[in-house]
Regions:
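C-terminal lobe and adjacent flexible extensions of AdoMet/dcAdoMet transferase-like proteins
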Residues: 206, 210-269
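Conserved class I S-adenosyl-L-methionine
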Residues: 1-39, 44, 52, 56, 138-176
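A short acidic, Gly/Pro-enriched loop at the edge of an enzyme's catalytic core
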Residues: 95-107
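Class I SAM-dependent methyltransferase SAM/SAH-binding core
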Residues: 44, 52-96
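A short glycine-rich, Lys/Arg-flanked "PGG" loop and its adjoining helix->strand segment in the class I
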Residues: 123-135
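Acceptor-substrate binding/catalytic loop of class I
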Residues: 116, 187-202
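A short SAM/SAH-binding and catalytic strip from SAM-dependent methyltransferases
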Residues: 106-120
Length: 269
């Protein structure tokens, strides 16, 4: 847990959604959330990092509570909060949410689940989300695909794709694909801290186990993220819309879900 805390406390999220694939992730996540959330909701953004989604949702007219484990991330969120998107930001833990029963319209778990390698902890996080949700309240949970690193290593994304020839990297992705456990090698200090990578089916099963009604799973970046020269195409409006149309059409196809680095599962209490 210290590795995870230090990773985020040292600013891992600062700028991440404003560069590279983070831009696609941010755009698509907002697009998906917009289908369910407009304004006037009480939203608990649990594990929401530096508040990128919290700020956006607050600007839409929601009462947003950012509850984040890393102290420096909370302080960054407070220091960079704009007047027109005010939200509550405080330290907290997804396993023990400091909020009353049935007090939120929406709970976002778009960060904590990556780092709960113990299944019991993941079920506890889902149970806490259900506890604080009002009747028929919405939960959106994010997962990282256990095939993401493997797909990245084999893809045309980036300039060099010789990772599978590195035994250290290869052993890392073998662990991810077979057990879901991501153990960051010391040779790759900028990789995400120790995590649990999963599948949408596994996450849906865990969510249903704590009596949520699972509505659907949606791929975030989908199959477009390894497009050659993605950054250039994304800057071109016509190309960007074509890419987005592709991912929208395929976003719920089970056969495509594992190709997406991130996915969201939508559920109701």
């Amino acid at each position: 847990m210290n590795e995870i805390y230090d990773f985020y406390n040292n600013g891992a999220e600062i700028g991440r959604l404003e560069r590279g694939l983070g831009i696609v992730e941010f755009h698509r996540t907002k697009e998906i959330l917009s289908r369910y959330i407009n304004g006037g909701k009480v939203i608990y953004d649990i594990g929401g990092g530096i508040g990128m989604y919290a700020a956006w949702l607050a600007k839409l007219g929601n009462e947003v509570h950012l509850i984040e484990l890393a102290e420096n991330a909370v302080e960054y969120a407070k220091a960079n909060m704009m007047q027109d998107c005010h939200f509550i930001a405080e330290m907290g833990n997804a396993l023990e949410v400091n909020r009353p029963n049935e007090s939120a319209d929406v709970v976002l778990l778009m960060g904590p689940l990556y780092h709960l390698r113990d299944r019991g902890d993941r079920l506890q996080a889902f149970s806490e989300a259900r506890r604080v949700l009002k009747k028929s309240g919405l939960m959106v949970a994010a997962g990282i695909s256990k095939f993401g690193s493997m797909t990245w290593a084999l893809s045309v994304y980036g300039e060099k794709n010789d990772f599978i020839d590195d035994p250290v990297f290869f052993n890392m992705i073998l662990g991810e694909m077979t057990t879901g456990d991501h153990i960051r090698p010391t040779e790759y200090p900028k990789f995400v801290a120790e995590s649990y990578f999963t599948t949408s089916e596994e996450m849906k099963t865990e969510i249903a186990e704590v009596s949520f009604s699972v509505e659907k799973a949606v791929a975030v970046e989908g199959c477009i993220w390894f497009t050659p020269h993605l950054a250039e195409k994304w800057e071109d409006e016509a190309s960007r819309e074509r890419l987005l149309e592709i991912v929208r059409i395929t976003e719920s196809e089970p056969e495509m879900m594992g190709m997406s680095p991130h996915f969201l599962v939508v559920a109701r209490k």
